[in-house]
Amino acid sequence: MANSKFGYVRQFETHDVILPQCYIVVRIDGKKFHEFSKFYEFAKPNDENALKLMNACAKNLVLKYKNDIILAFGESDEYSFILKSSTTLFNRRKDKLATLFGSFFTSNYVALWAKFFPEKPLNIKHLPYFDSRCVAYPNLQTIKDYLSWRYVDTHINNLYNTTFWQLIIKCGLTPQESEKKLCGTFSNEKQEILFSECGINYNNEPEMFKKGSLVTRKGEILHINVIAQIDELFEGY
């Protein structure tokens, strides 16, 4: 950068750095994706192509930074990228990690859109974009708990959304009626409603919907019981 008498303004810039020895999670979330998915008529409760598009973007990001990323996990319109505690990527700067991961993911989403939605060209007034946050986690157990949290959240959200939408699609309920019917119900009760009233066995739903998607450093996309394999996933880290 050229020197000039105006260069003093750089003194006002701040660069937060993630503490050393901490694991780093960069989590990306679709911004206003409720409106976005409605405009492009995503299938409810899950749009398989939309999820596969998210997975493709995540895979490209993981492979780009495979020396720093342990794994990535995604559900719906979010993805979490877990970085090694020893990473020096972008000098561990919070702003760089959050903005570059977010922009890389967004650009891939736009570039790959036509592959997954060839009959739905992107509208300039309804473009996808993602927010991104960067969080430090102090030890291995905490990062395992983080991934377990996102995995459990996937199950809870998908079971609710599946039951909610099937009551509307198959049973003719209004959104308000479906919400009221599910209010206060537990997981086993939702599964019973799905089976007895909608004729759907939740256990037979696609693994990607129920378990989310995990991307390994090699770019493999898996749909597994994360909690059952949590120690194996972080072996050596």
From Swiss-Prot:
Changing residue 185 to A: Significantly affects the G(-1) addition. GO terms for molecular function: 3'-5' RNA polymerase activity; GTP binding; identical protein binding; magnesium ion binding; tRNA guanylyltransferase activity. Changing residue 155 to A: Significantly affects the G(-1) addition. Changing residue 150 to A: Significantly affects the G(-1) addition. Mg(2+) binds at residues 29-30, 77. The keyword Nucleotide-binding applies. Belongs to the tRNA(His) guanylyltransferase family. It catalyses: a 5'-end ribonucleotide-tRNA(His) + GTP + ATP + H2O = a 5'-end phospho-guanosine-ribonucleotide-tRNA(His) + AMP + 2 diphosphate + H(+); a 5'-end ribonucleotide-RNA + a ribonucleoside 5'-triphosphate + ATP + H2O = a 5'-end phospho-ribonucleoside-ribonucleotide-RNA + AMP + 2 diphosphate + H(+). Its EC number is 2.7.7.79. It is an enzyme of class 2 (transferase). GTP binds at residues 32-34, 44, 47. This is tRNA(His) guanylyltransferase. The gene is THG1. GO terms for biological process: tRNA modification; tRNA processing. Changing residue 133 to A: Significantly affects the G(-1) addition. Gene3D superfamilies: 3.30.70.3000. The lineage of its organism: Eukaryota, Fungi, Dikarya, Ascomycota, Saccharomycotina. It comes from Saccharomyces cerevisiae (strain ATCC 204508 / S288c) (Baker's yeast). Present with 1170 molecules/cell in log phase SD medium. InterPro entries: Thg1_C_dom, tRNAHis_GuaTrfase_cat, tRNAHis_GuaTrfase_Thg1, tRNAHis_GuaTrfase_Thg1_sf. Keywords: Acetylation, GTP-binding, Magnesium, Metal-binding, Nucleotide-binding, Nucleotidyltransferase, Transferase, tRNA processing.
